[in-house]
């Protein structure tokens, strides 16, 4: 079992139950899924770029990502409908907890000049969005084999009803928020 899942069951859930006064164990917010998205503007000219990004995202997530396609044609960006413009993957279950553990305990502390993540990046429905500027913070990516630095969006979707509940859940799981 993932360390973070174990921590959730033994420490986080009882603390949340006490703080918010839930009547049922099922009311306690939990991680539902983690979505990792890589938007690649350069992919329209260079198909190899997309293949490399998909491969790297697969290594980071531990499962094969899908390529995202443009919904509309935009002349200013030279994008036509149906062109591949990025890659994304959705993690659930054990893989989600494993990834959350690696993100919080290994990847985020490796970010240059890291002082914590923004505590205001909640969407109003209890979900947290986080932008990463480079894929090198993940230990699975070998520095020598990287041709280009790519960023990604990581969205942590929770079952929380409010940002306050979600913030407390992530804080108890070990997410390093800035003060």
Curated annotation (Swiss-Prot):
A Pfam family that the UniProt record links to this protein: Ribosomal_L5_C
InterPro entries: Ribosomal_uL5, Ribosomal_uL5_bac-type, Ribosomal_uL5_C, Ribosomal_uL5_CS, Ribosomal_uL5_dom_sf, Ribosomal_uL5_N
Cellular component GO terms held in the UniProt record: ribonucleoprotein complex; ribosome
Molecular function terms from GO: rRNA binding; structural constituent of ribosome; tRNA binding
GO BP terms: translation
SUPFAM superfamilies, alphabetized: RL5-like (SSF55282)
Family matches, as Gene3D superfamilies: 3.30.1440.10
Alphabetized UniProt keyword annotations: Ribonucleoprotein, Ribosomal protein, RNA-binding, rRNA-binding, tRNA-binding
Keyword S-adenosyl-L-methionine: no
Function: This is one of the proteins that bind and probably mediate the attachment of the 5S RNA into the large ribosomal subunit, where it forms part of the central protuberance. In the 70S ribosome it contacts protein S13 of the 30S subunit (bridge B1b), connecting the 2 subunits; this bridge is implicated in subunit movement. Contacts the P site tRNA; the 5S rRNA and some of its associated proteins might help stabilize positioning of ribosome-bound tRNAs.
Family: Belongs to the universal ribosomal protein uL5 family.
Record note on quaternary structure: Part of the 50S ribosomal subunit; part of the 5S rRNA/L5/L18/L25 subcomplex. Contacts the 5S rRNA and the P site tRNA. Forms a bridge to the 30S subunit in the 70S ribosome.
HAMAP family linked: Ribosomal_uL5_B
Name this polypeptide is given: Large ribosomal subunit protein uL5
Organism in which the protein naturally occurs: Alkaliphilus metalliredigens (strain QYMF)
Higher taxonomy: Bacteria, Bacillati, Bacillota, Clostridia, Peptostreptococcales
């Amino acid at each position: 079992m993932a360390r973070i899942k174990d921590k959730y069951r033994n420490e986080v859930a009882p603390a949340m139950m006490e703080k918010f006064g839930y009547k049922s164990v099922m009311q306690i917010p939990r991680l539902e899924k983690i979505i990792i998205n890589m938007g690649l503007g350069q992919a329209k000219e260079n198909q190899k770029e997309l293949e490399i990004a998909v491969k790297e995202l697969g290594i980071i997530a531990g499962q094969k990502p899908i390529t995202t396609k443009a919904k509309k044609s935009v002349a200013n960006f030279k994008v036509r409908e149906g062109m591949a413009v990025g890659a994304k993957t959705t993690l659930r279950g054990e893989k989600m907890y494993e990834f959350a553990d690696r993100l919080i305990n290994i990847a985020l502390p490796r970010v240059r000049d890291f002082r914590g993540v923004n505590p205001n990046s909640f969407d109003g429905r209890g979900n947290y969005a986080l932008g990463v500027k480079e894929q090198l913070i993940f230990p699975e990516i070998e520095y020598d084999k990287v041709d280009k630095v790519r960023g990604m969006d990581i969205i942590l979707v929770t079952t929380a009803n409010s940002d306050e509940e979600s913030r407390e859940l992530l804080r108890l799981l070990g997410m390093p928020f800035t003060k």
